[in-house]
Structures are given as structure tokens and as C-alpha cells.
């Protein structure tokens, strides 16, 4: 998460002051959540990103690993809003850490089967794990196996109006009166110059 002051300082550093320039785009992302940045674009809303960052920072390690596994299979990743809702619906999933493949999965679930000890060396754990994965619709992600266990996925977040005030950080830099006057003068001078160029071009075309 970040703060309004940090956002203002960054915008001022790149010349986005809300007067001369208002638009910007994000060229890169950095963070510790595996795979998250594959689903973020250069035009994301800063308040939404910060809200997501705040929610992720509140997750314990096991839920964070579960979140990473879910997004690895591409579920609820079409927008930042989807990702925000996912952080609040992780109880709809079951995550099995260190289950890396079908054989691991088969061995894990076979513990509940009444397999005689003398037959365990002949049991096809990989085939059994494959059947379990197919039947459950599970996914092998970096770090473990993820499966959705509930369809009760709720939409807690719809749009930016749902962002708590304490998570809102976007604000243009605060300019002094002198800085504001200089910015407006630059805009006016630029508009006058552009108007003069258009007039000169029109006169040349008429001649």
C-alpha cells in the first residue's frame, strides 16, 4: 500500500500536476505476489490498486499462497475488481501446499483409502491423482494444488465507490500560487502559439 503524499510526490516528479498534464500510464509493476502483475494493465486506477494492495497485506501467508494459486489458474483475474473480490472469497477454495503433480495428489488422497499394505507398492497413485484432479476441476499451481470447494462466491466490490476512504490515495500534487500561475501561463501561451500556427497554415493554403 501507499499514501497520498507518496502519490503526489511521484506525480510531481514526472510532471503530472493536474494542470499541464492530467493523464499517465503505468510502465511496470513490482511486488511479492507471484503472478499478480500478469493481470494488471498500464491504465489501472491507482485507488483500486491501493485498495487491492491493502487487502493483500491483510492476508496471512496461507491465504496469500491460496490467492497466488487461484490467479495462476486464471480464475477471477479479468480486472482489478475481480482480484479485489477474490481476496474476500478465498474461503471458497481449498489449497494443498507442496502437492506438485498427479502422483503427489494420488498419494495424499489414497491415505483415506483402505489399501492393504502389501498392495500399496502396486497402486497407481498417478492415475488416481489424475482422476481426482479431473473430477474436482483442480489445478496444479506453483506451490501446491488448488480446487474450488464452494460456489458461494460473493461480489463485495463493484466499482470505485466501494473503496474505503482510508484506501483512497490519488491526488494531484498541491501547487503553490506561483506554480499554478506558471502552469496556466504555459497552457495559454501554448494555445496561442498553436492558434497562430493554424492561422499561418490557413493563410498559406489560401495563397
Where are each of the predicted segments found?
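A broad, low-specificity signal marking well-ordered, structured residues that form hydrophobic/aromatic
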Residues: 24, 144, 205
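Short, surface-exposed polybasic-aromatic patches that bind anionic ligands, especially phosphate groups
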Residues: 126-150, 157
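Non-Sec secretion/translocation targeting segments of pathogen effectors
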Residues: 124, 178-207
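Intrinsically disordered, low-complexity segments enriched in small/polar residues
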Residues: 29, 91, 104, 123-126, 141-143, 170, 188, ...
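Mixed-charge (acidic/basic) macromolecular-recognition segments
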Residues: 3, 7-121, 150-174, 180
Amino acid at each position: 500500500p501507499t499514501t497520498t503524499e507518496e502519490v503526489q510526490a511521484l506525480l510531481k516528479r514526472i510532471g503530472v500536476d493536474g494542470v499541464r498534464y492530467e493523464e499517465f500510464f503505468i510502465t511496470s509493476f513490482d511486488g511479492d505476489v507471484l503472478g499478480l502483475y500478469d493481470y494488471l494493465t498500464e491504465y489501472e486506477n491507482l485507488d483500486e490498486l491501493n485498495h487491492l494492495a491493502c487487502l493483500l497485506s491483510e492476508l496471512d501467508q496461507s491465504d496469500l499462497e491460496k490467492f497466488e494459486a487461484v490467479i495462476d489458474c486464471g480464475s477471477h483475474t479479468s480486472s482489478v475488481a475481480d482480484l479485489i473480490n477474490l481476496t474476500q472469497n478465498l474461503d471458497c477454495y481449498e489449497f494443498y501446499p507442496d502437492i506438485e503433480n498427479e502422483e503427489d495428489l494420488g498419494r495424499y488422497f489414497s491415505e483415506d483409502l483402505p489399501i492393504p499394505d502389501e498392495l500399496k507398492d502396486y497402486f497407481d497413485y498417478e492415475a488416481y491423482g489424475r482422476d481426482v484432479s479431473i473430477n474436482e476441476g483442480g489445478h496444479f499451481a506453483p506451490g501446491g494444488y488448488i480446487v474450488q470447494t464452494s460456489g458461494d462466491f460473493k461480489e463485495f466490490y463493484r466499482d470505485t465507490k466501494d473503496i474505503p476512504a482510508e484506501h483512497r490515495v490519488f491526488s494531484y500534487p498541491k501547487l503553490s500560487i506561483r506554480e499554478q500561475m506558471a502552469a496556466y501561463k504555459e497552457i495559454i501561451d501554448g494555445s496561442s502559439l498553436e492558434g497562430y500556427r493554424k492561422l499561418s497554415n490557413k493563410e498559406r493554403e489560401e495563397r
